[in-house]
UniProtKB/Swiss-Prot annotation:
Gene3D superfamilies, sorted: 3.30.70.1730, 6.10.250.2350
Designated name of the protein: Large ribosomal subunit protein uL10
Taxonomic lineage: Bacteria, Pseudomonadati, Pseudomonadota, Gammaproteobacteria, Enterobacterales
Function statement: Forms part of the ribosomal stalk, playing a central role in the interaction of the ribosome with GTP-bound translation factors.
Gene: rplJ
Assembly behavior: Part of the ribosomal stalk of the 50S ribosomal subunit. The N-terminus interacts with L11 and the large rRNA to form the base of the stalk. The C-terminus forms an elongated spine to which L12 dimers bind in a sequential fashion forming a multimeric L10(L12)X complex.
Amino acid sequence: MALNLQDKQAIVAEVSEVAKGALSAVVADSRGVTVDKMTELRKAGREAGVYMRVVRNTLLRRVVEGTQFECLKDAFVGPTLIAYSMEHPGAAARLFKDFAKANAKFEVKAAAFEGELIPASQIDRLATLPTYEEAIARLMATMKEASAGKLVRTLAAVRDAKEAA
């Protein structure tokens, strides 16, 4: 489908605006994946706060120019599906990783987080980041365990002091 200049400018403007507010980005190749499966992926992406779009590589290079995602430029080869995580840095990576397990033809190319390029082989680094709620829960569990341990040690010290007296 041929795009005129106004269409291209609109696409670049829209995706650039999304990129400004994104926490991370993941690039994938979806050749060979059925339309039904892609529709499921897009639906799951909307629910997870992930913006997805298939964009021409030349337009994507313009979009990422001067942003924290500029390191992805070399990954823009062949059909490119880009996903921006809007709410949680690992959301798009987690979504693509799970989708790639179920669909062998779906290939994750690379990801970017805070200006760092993450190759597809290391996508788990980004996908396994805990959500905000999970991180708070882990912190609270650690604090609770520490205070319980302190209480046990204090009671043991009191018991030892009473036995010694």
